[in-house]
Amino acid sequence: SVQVSSYIPGRIRLYSKRLIGNAGLCRQVYTYISSYHEIDSVEVNVVTGSVLIKYQPGLLRTNHELAKVEQYVVKHIERR
C-alpha cells in the first residue's frame, strides 16, 4: 500500500513499505513516474521507501490522467 505523506501544489511525498530495500522496484517507480514530461523531478529512496515528486501544477493539470492522480492525492493525504 502507498500512503500520501505530504502534499502542497507542486510537491507530493508518498511512502510505501514495499520500496524499502527493493532497488528494482524503486527503479521501476522512478522510470514510470519520470516518463511523464509534466513531472519535473522524482526522488525514490530505497532506505525509507519514500517517493518525492516535484512538478509545476499548471502543466501537470493539462494531462487529464495526472490531474486525476493529483485529485486522488488531495483526498487521501494523511491528516495529522
Please give the residue ranges for each predicted region.
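Short glycine-/aliphatic-rich beta-strand segments at the starts of folded cytosolic domains
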Residues: S1-N22
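Short acidic amphipathic segments
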Residues: S1-V2, L14, V29-S50, K54
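Functionally constrained cores in energy, signaling, and assembly domains
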Residues: S5, S16, Y36, E65-K68
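Helix N-cap motif at beta-to-alpha junctions
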Residues: L19, Q56-L60
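Ser/Thr-Pro-rich, acidic low-complexity intrinsically disordered regions of eukaryotic RNA-binding
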Residues: N22-Q28
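Charge-rich, low-aromatic oligomerization/scaffolding segments with amphipathic character
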Residues: L59-H76
